[in-house]
Every structure is written in structure tokens, then in C-alpha cells.
Amino acid sequence: MPSYYVNKNIQPTGEHEVHKEGCHRMPELQNRVYLGYFSNAIDAVREARRYYTNVD
């Protein structure tokens, strides 16, 4: 299962983006929150909503 992260910075469209380990758009280490291992992005987004309300 891959690791997922959420960007601490808000995107111009207003949400915090979730990224899978290895993503070419992965935020810098200081700009991301580790979410954990998930078998799919939907579960990772659910976890990210514990930190931020507007997540994609």
C-alpha cells in the first residue's frame, strides 16, 4: 500500500491536495502532513479531512 500526504498549503482553487508517495507534484517536506498507508485515494482523502475541511 502506498503512503499518502496532504499539502499544508491551500491551492489557488481553495483546497488542500492529497498526494501519493512518488507523485511528481509532491509538496516539499515542510509543506505536507503524512496521512498513512492506504489502499486507495478515497480513504486517504477521508483521513485528510481530519486536518482540513476542503480537500481534493
Put a short name on every predicted segment:
Residues 4-5, 19, 38, 52:
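Aromatic side chains
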Residues 5-32:
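Short aromatic-glycine-(Arg/Gly/Cys) micro-motifs in beta-strand/loop hairpins
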Residues 28-40, 56:
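A short, exposed loop/beta-hairpin motif centered on an aromatic-Gly-Thr core
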Residues 45-56:
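Short, compact, well-ordered microdomains
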